[in-house]
């Protein structure tokens, strides 16, 4: 079954990957322990903290919701067997390759930056044999690093398949129509924050809470079950943007000022989750309204975005390791790191694209 391509989702996915690269580049200049990247400058650029916090608020929710929407489209044009094969080839295989080959190199660069003189061979053995602890990789042990996103998507794809199959087989369901009619009313979609809040109350892996992102992945799928939702997001996009802007201000600037589980802390957490979802709704509405168009540049960017997501963090770390040692203005260092990460990531994609084995392990279509 042929489906109409949603070019706006391609544009938003490309934008989301760029924001991940920007986020990791900003974090090099945020010296607080929670700002986890594998290279650090000696200068703290304080405005970068607010910028990175804002990006972090909505960017991964955007990517997970788009992933759920894309799964809906994928299942319309594939059998269950084809879908599962695609998930193994496009998610599990690249994630496994990256965790085994890319991440040890990246975390070894971190060890060099802190003057750890352990040889690479010895380090590799420790990477796979030490207790992984919190999975950050900071102590020289195993980490999925940024590839946690691919691992989560693979698991979600398997867990949700029975539900998605059941939903797709339900035709002309009156209850489904009534639900879509209700949720498509002005700003009613905001109630979808309730299951996200419930998931967030179960604290697992902090900001990588798999329950929260699973709910967002499911939400993405269900947003594609009725065209009413697309029209509603287009209609309400500016209102969602205003709500998201106000709530994100509260979350970014007041999130850490109150005692955990106090009344004000709970209110700020609610505002934060509302911000995450409403900013994504605004972006989906704006994307469909203004960017649902094909172009040659979009084809290249969309085809390369998965590979660039995989490789950018290693390149960012390697470039950062060199640049932070140069006697340059910190803002200039940041600009150079960001620019070189983008350029070298695209060059890497262009170089490996004709090589069948590398195409496979880097998820190139």
Task: Give, region by region, the residue ranges found by the protein language model.
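Transmembrane alpha-helical segments
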Residues: 67, 155, 159, 163, ...
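Hydrophobic, small-residue-rich membrane helices and short re-entrant helix-turn-helix hairpins
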Residues: 79-85, 224-235
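Functional transmembrane helices that form membrane-embedded active or gating regions
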Residues: 4-16, 85, 89, 233-245, ...
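Alpha-helical transmembrane segments of multi-pass integral membrane proteins
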Residues: 98, 244-355
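Hydrophobic residues within membrane-embedded alpha-helical segments of Major Facilitator Superfamily
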Residues: 19-22, 62-64, 216, 223, ...
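Interfacial loop-to-helix transition and helix-capping segments at the boundaries
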Residues: 48-61, 138-152, 198-217, 232-240, ...
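Membrane-cytosol interface segments of multi-pass membrane proteins
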Residues: 1-209, 299, 325-365
